Curated annotation (Swiss-Prot):
Annotated gene: atpA
Organism the protein comes from: Chlorobium phaeovibrioides (strain DSM 265 / 1930)
Keywords: ATP synthesis, ATP-binding, Cell inner membrane, Cell membrane, CF(1), Hydrogen ion transport, Ion transport, Membrane, Nucleotide-binding, Translocase, Transport
The protein's name: ATP synthase subunit alpha
GO MF term (any one): ADP binding
Functional summary from the UniProt entry: Produces ATP from ADP in the presence of a proton gradient across the membrane. The alpha chain is a regulatory subunit.
Length: 526
C-alpha cells in the first residue's frame, strides 16, 4: 500500500474545508464602566452611542443613555446598580428604548420596560414602539368634538372632557385624585375606549388596590396597568409615563380610542430631578433641571384626536415602520395627568407648568373633601378649555347655568354667615344652591350614565327639587332614577339616543318628577 502524500488531494480537501467554513464572529461596540452608583453609570468607549439607546450591563441589567459627553457617556440603570462595578464591560444594543404593544397587553400589569409583573406568564406580541416619539403635527390632528364621559356629574356637567383632550387632575394628597381617575376608567366599560393606568412612585400596596378595584368592576378587560412603584429605581419612574403614551399611541394610530392616566407626574419630575442632579446637569428653580417643562410638554402633546382622513393619517410624522400597515384615521388619545400639590399651592413650579400645558384642570380641595363634598371639586378654579365643544346638547342645555348658580350660592353662603335677616329671594337662592351641591355629590366607583345625569340635574336647575328636603336629596335621586328606569325608560332612551333634551321629553320628565315628589314626601313624613 502506497503511503505517498498527493499534494493535489490535500489541497482539494483543504479547499472543501475552507469553502464550508462560516465565520461566527459577532461585532459589538463595548465600553468600560468608569464610575457607578445611585443608579447612574459613567461609561468610557461607546463612541457611537445614541441618546435614549439601551445598553446592556453585566448580570442582565439594562440601562439607557441620557448624557453624551466629550469623553464618556452618562447612563441610567434600570436594575440594582450595586451589582455593577468599575471596569465592567458595557455593550451597546443599537436599539432605542421601546415597549411591546398590542391587544395582548390588556388586562395585564407590566413594568415600564413592558415586562409582565402580575405572574400571569409571558405576553405574546410582535410589535414594539419607541418610548420617545414626536407628537403628531397640526395637519394630522382634528379638533376635540367627541365626549369622553367620566360618569361623575360635577365633571360631565361643568368641566366636560373630550376625546383627545389633556385634562389635569390636581389637588393635595388624600383629596380623591386617584378615585376620579379610576371612576373614569370604570365608566369606559362598553364604550370602546382602551385605558392605560400609569402608577409612578406609588406604594406597591396602592397599585395592588387599584388593580383589585379595576378587576372587581370588570374594567381590567380593557385596561393595562404600568407600574413603577416607590421602591423601583428612579430611571423606571422617569420612563413610565412614556411607556404609557407609547401604548396609547398604538390604539390611537390604529383608529381606536385610548385613555391614559399618569398618576402622578409630580413624582416623575422628582425622579427626573434626581437623575439630572446625579448626572451633574445644572439645576434651576426648586433644583429641577431647566428642561423639566419640556419633559412634560413633549409627553402630554402626544395626546391628540387624529384626523378621519386615512391618507393624511398614513403620512403622520415619526410614524414607526411597524405601525404603517395598520394606520387608520379617527383615533384619539386622551390624557389625564395627576399632580399633587402641597397645602393647596397651585403656584409652585411643577403645578404651574402642567396647568399651562394642559387643556384645563380639575382642582380638588381638602376643605371640601373634609366637609363631605365628594368628589371635592372646586368649581371656581376648575376649567375645561376645549371640552365644551364635545359636550352633548342635552347636558349643555341643563347645566348651562349650573356653574353660575353654584358661584352665586358660594358667595351668598359666605355673606349669610354675617347676618340672620335674609330676604325671601336670597333665602330661595341659598336653598336652591344647597340642593344643587347635594345633587353633585356622588359615591366612589359608581359612575352614572349621562342620560341619568341630565335627568337629575334638570330637576335641580328647574327648581323641581325645592319641595324635597336637603337631607333627603340623595335618597330621592336614587329612588327617582330607579322609578324612571322602571316606569319611563323611554325618557332616558330619548336622551341617550338623540343626545338632546326634546321639549316633549322635558315635559314628560317634569310630570314624572312632580308625581314622584308627592309620593316621596309622603313616605318621608310617615
Amino acid at each position: 500500500m502506497s503511503t505517498t502524500v498527493r499534494p493535489d488531494e490535500v489541497s482539494s480537501i483543504l479547499r472543501k474545508q475552507l469553502a464550508g467554513f462560516e465565520s461566527e464572529a459577532e461585532v459589538y461596540d463595548v465600553g468600560t464602566v468608569l464610575q457607578v452608583g445611585d443608579g447612574i453609570a459613567r461609561v468610557y468607549g461607546l463612541l457611537k452611542a445614541a441618546a435614549g439607546e439601551l445598553l446592556e450591563f453585566p448580570h442582565n441589567i439594562m440601562g439607557m443613555v441620557l448624557n453624551l459627553e466629550e469623553d464618556n457617556v452618562g447612563a441610567v440603570m434600570f436594575g440594582a446598580s450595586n451589582a455593577v462595578k468599575e471596569g465592567d464591560t458595557v455593550r451597546r444594543t443599537g436599539i432605542l428604548a421601546s415597549i411591546p404593544v398590542g391587544e395582548a397587553m390588556l388586562g395585564r400589569v407590566i413594568n415600564p420596560l413592558g415586562e409582565p409583573i402580575d405572574g400571569k406568564g409571558a405576553i405574546e406580541t410582535s410589535i414594539r414602539l419607541p418610548l420617545e416619539r414626536r407628537a403628531p403635527g397640526v395637519i394630522y390632528r382634528k379638533s376635540v368634538h367627541e365626549p369622553l364621559q367620566t360618569g361623575l356629574k360635577a365633571i360631565d356637567a361643568m368641566i366636560p372632557i373630550g376625546r383627545g383632550q389633556r385634562e389635569l387632575i390636581i389637588g393635595d394628597r388624600q383629596t380623591g385624585k386617584t378615585a376620579v381617575a379610576l371612576d373614569t376608567i370604570i365608566n369606559q366599560k362598553g364604550k370602546g375606549v382602551y385605558c392605560i393606568y400609569v402608577a409612578i412612585g406609588l406604594k406597591g400596596s396602592t397599585v395592588a388596590q387599584v388593580v383589585n378595584t379595576l378587576e372587581k368592576h370588570g374594567a381590567m378587560e380593557y385596561t393595562t396597568v404600568i407600574s413603577a412603584t416607590a421602591s423601583d429605581p428612579a430611571p423606571l419612574q422617569f420612563i413610565a409615563p412614556f411607556a404609557g403614551a407609547a401604548l396609547g399611541e398604538y390604539f390611537r394610530d390604529t383608529g381606536r380610542h385610548a385613555l391614559v392616566i399618569y398618576d402622578d407626574l409630580s413624582k416623575q419630575a422628582v425622579a427626573y430631578r434626581q437623575l439630572s442632579l446625579l448626572l451633574r446637569r445644572p439645576p434651576g428653580r426648586e433644583a429641577y433641571p431647566g428642561d423639566v417643562f419640556f419633559l412634560h410638554s413633549r409627553l402630554l402633546e402626544r395626546a391628540a384626536k387624529i384626523t378621519d382622513d386615512i391618507e393624511v393619517a398614513k403620512k403622520m410624522n415619526d410614524l414607526p415602520e411597524a405601525l404603517k400597515p395598520m394606520v387608520k384615521g379617527g383615533g384619539s388619545l386622551t390624557a389625564l395627568p395627576v399632580i399633587e400639590t402641597q397645602a393647596g399651592d397651585v403656584s409652585a413650579y411643577i403645578p404651574t407648568n402642567v396647568i399651562s400645558i394642559t387643556d384645563g384642570q380639575i382642582f380638588l380641595e381638602s376643605n371640601l373633601f373634609n366637609s363631605g363634598q365628594r368628589p371635592a371639586i372646586n368649581v371656581g378654579i376648575s376649567v375645561s378649555r376645549v371640552g365644551g365643544a364635545a359636550q352633548i346638547k342635552a347636558m349643555k342645555k341643563v347645566a348651562g347655568t349650573l356653574r353660575l348658580d353654584l358661584a352665586q350660592f358660594r358667595e351668598l353662603e359666605a355673606f349669610s354667615k354675617f347676618g340672620s335677616d335674609l330676604d325671601k329671594t336670597t333665602k330661595a337662592q341659598l336653598d336652591r344652591g344647597a340642593r344643587l351641591v347635594e345633587i353633585l355629590k356622588q359615591g366612589q366607583y359608581i359612575p352614572m350614565p349621562v342620560e341619568k345625569q341630565v335627568a337629575i340635574i334638570f330637576l335641580g336647575t328647574q327648581g323641581l327639587l325645592d319641595a324635597v328636603a336637603v337631607d333627603h336629596i340623595r335618597k330621592f335621586e336614587e329612588d327617582f332614577l330607579a322609578m324612571l328606569e322602571l316606569k319611563h325608560p323611554e325618557i332616558l332612551k330619548s336622551i341617550e339616543e338623540k343626545g338632546s333634551l326634546e321639549p316633549d321629553t322635558a315635559n314628560g320628565l317634569k310630570e314624572a318628577a312632580a308625581k314622584f315628589i308627592i309620593t316621596f314626601n309622603e313616605k318621608a313624613k310617615a
